[in-house]
Amino acid sequence: MRHGDISSSHDTVGVAVVNYKMPRLHTKKEVIENAKNIANMIVGMKQGLPGMDLVIFPEYSTMGIMYDRKEMFETATTIPGPETEIFAEACRKANTWGVFSLTGEQHEEHPHKNPYNTLVLINNKGEIVQKYRKIIPWCPIEGWYPGDTTYVTEGPKGIKISLIICDDGNYPEIWRDCAMKGAELIVRCQGYMYPAKEQQIMMAKTMAWANNVYVAVANATGFDGVYSYFGHSAIIGFDGRTLGECGEEENGIQYAEISLSQIRDFRQNAQSQNHLFKLLHRGYTGIIQSGEGDKGVAECPFDFYRTWVMDAEKARENVEKITRTTIGTAECPIEGIPHEGKEKEASV
């Protein structure tokens, strides 16, 4: 793992993350113009970072947040579509891979159902090689139709890549799912705003450590008239240490080289902190010394996960017992979100 140079090598993947300024757009024409700006940025970045193999832009960077529902449906796109064609041409021209946000992608039953919040991974030939739909939209605010699975794709120089989006990353399950599928780099594109800056910085580092995986975070910056975005796009080593991190500057860029051989050697040979291996070989030292084989215990010890897999409604019932039974809360009502009880009277 290296930071500070502009190069890369046969063993390292050059990764750039962009603190893209959150756009405030309203029409398809404005979206296309912004996509062209992103494309021009890619070509310029490659000139300054000749080792760049992969460039990552934040959630909402292409379309911004359409706070108007009508505008959200009017600007929802298809994949492939005009935006991805612009990005594909830029990736070919710059000879680099890219991760791009489409908010939103038209639902199969468009316009009768809400769009998806989608990322695409485009290779240096301009081909879309992964399309990921956000599994856990940021409720109650986001109205995206939820996706249902994660993916792993072989990326530049053979590194295995998974994509996740913003609020997805608050749930350890999604990181573990990607890592257990073989991901070596988990890309988290986010449009995260204050006040959750410190929590999100910690989450990315912790999940890198817990899953023995590289993490690249691209976050928005600026103020779009509603939210203020904190940036801090970063590249994090599989040991949880930050290789490079932006501040809050608009359109700031960080760059690092992540080693293929180092992560693969670690996963093969590390012992006390090899979290992926140890989870499925629990207590192997004690099992060996007890004469019960040399593999440890593989069975899942966690009641919640067993219940969730075998009886999702029962798992939901259990969580409602310790939280609440309605989607909304009368203490802080949000329009369109059902709740029980009277609204809390405002204090005088």
From Swiss-Prot:
The UniProt entry, under InterPro entries, shows: Aliph_Amidase/BUP, Aliphatic_amidase, C-N_Hydrolase, C-N_Hydrolase_sf
Q: How does activity depend on pH?
A: Optimum pH is 7.
Q: What positions does UniProt annotate as the active site of this protein? A: 59, 134, 166
The broad enzyme category this protein falls into is hydrolase
Q: Which Pfam families match?
A: CN_hydrolase (PF00795)
What does the record give as the reaction this protein catalyses? Answer: a monocarboxylic acid amide + H2O = a monocarboxylate + NH4(+)
Which residue intervals define the domain CN hydrolase in the entry?
Answer: 13-260
Instruction: Report the temperature dependence from the record.
Output: Optimum temperature is 55 degrees Celsius.
Q: Which domain of life is it from?
A: Bacteria
Q: Name one GO molecular function term.
A: amidase activity
Q: Which UniProt keywords apply?
A: Hydrolase
Give the EC number(s) under which this enzyme is classified: 3.5.1.4
* Statement: the UniProt record of this protein carries the keyword DNA damage: no
Q: Does the keyword Hydrolase apply?
A: yes
HAMAP family attached to this UniProt entry: Aliphatic_amidase
Q: Which family does it belong to?
A: Belongs to the carbon-nitrogen hydrolase superfamily. Aliphatic amidase family.
NCBIfam families, A to Z: PRK13286.1 (NF009802)
What functional role does this protein have? Catalyzes the hydrolysis of short-chain aliphatic amides to their corresponding organic acids with release of ammonia. Efficiently hydrolyzes propionamide, acetamide and acrylamide, but shows a very weak activity with aromatic and longer chain aliphatic amides.
Name of the featured protein:
Aliphatic amidase
**What organism, scientifically named, is this protein from?**
Geobacillus stearothermophilus (Bacillus stearothermophilus)
